[in-house]
UniProtKB/Swiss-Prot annotation:
Keyword Cytoplasm: yes
Gene name of the record: prfB
Job of this protein: Peptide chain release factor 2 directs the termination of translation in response to the peptide chain termination codons UGA and UAA.
Modified residues (N5-methylglutamine): Q254
UniProt keyword list: Cytoplasm, Methylation, Protein biosynthesis
Family in the record: Belongs to the prokaryotic/mitochondrial release factor family.
Source organism per UniProt: Leptospira borgpetersenii serovar Hardjo-bovis (strain JB197)
Record-given protein name: Peptide chain release factor 2
Record's subcellular location: Cytoplasm
Gene Ontology MF terms: translation release factor activity, codon specific
Keyword tRNA processing: no
Amino acid sequence: MEVKSAKELKRVSKELQENFLNRWKLLNLEQDKDRLKALNEKSEDPDLWNNPEEARIVSQKKNELEKKLTPWFTIQQDILDFPDLVELTLDEKGENGIGELSMEYNRLQEKFEELELLGALKNSEDLKPAFLNIHPGAGGTESQDWAEMLLRMYIRYFEKKGYQYSLIDIQAGDGAGIKNVTLHVVGDFAFGFLKGENGIHRLVRISPFDANKRRHTSFVSVHVSPEIDDEIDIKIEEKDIRVDVYRSSGAGGQHVNTTDSAVRITHLPSGIVVACQNERSQIKNRDTAFKMLKARLYEMEQEKAKEELEKKSGEKKDIAWGSQIRSYVFHPYNLVKDHRTDHETGNVAAVMDGDIEPFILAYLKTL
């Protein structure tokens, strides 16, 4: 936006300041600031470290609050001081200062819009690392190949975003693609940014596996859940689970386990199945699998509570859990479209190379 007059600059600078203060109040950031101050004081108490578990929890909460507040602190003073800067610059330079002030306004407005998106990530889970699972639907090789294409898309996105990721479990497909894969993703607001990827991803293309070059439609389910803290109590009864151990079935190479160290846990009441094979130790694989199971069960409880609330308030969900969220059309035209936000692009190649941030941001704006 190009601001062309001194009068308009004064108006938009005060609007930006007011919007920032309103958002600060709405998100209770002053309370978070006080909590962070208290945690900083507590972490400096030498006696805290006599209790390693309490010290770990304090440190974790402190880090989470710092992640949440630092982006706001970074821009806070610039926005609050901007109306005064406008007055001083105009007094000193007159209309000659309008150009540089307009550029500064656009910079601050853009930063504030980014903060508003982060404001949509207000739940504590949004700050957490995430488990991302990709599972092909019916269709054999066709859908398994689509699952592998999505895996590459997400990995490219993580690399661009600066997220760290590790393959927890992967099962190779029959001849091509993958039957199932789970990744652990670590980074700022990892779950918050990825949670909108939950659902069915649909591909339309000319199949490379069809000798007659016919058009095929394939479906893959993506499921994202937050890594849960130990302080969140998720009870798992031994009688409710079945634990299987097996040999790693990765893509091969020197890191494939030659012992039965991979672990699969089935939660019998819910039917949830999780597996981990990336660690050398069966104990470590079991621990990671239990973390994944806790995450899935916690998420299931959260979803039930949300559905009950919507039921009581008379609201109806527009998009059902696990429904089709996005289509990727390679033929007869090029288009990727999100069915929840209507955000779309014809640059399919860029999307498949990890350029999915616009889709993620468009979804966050709806929250």
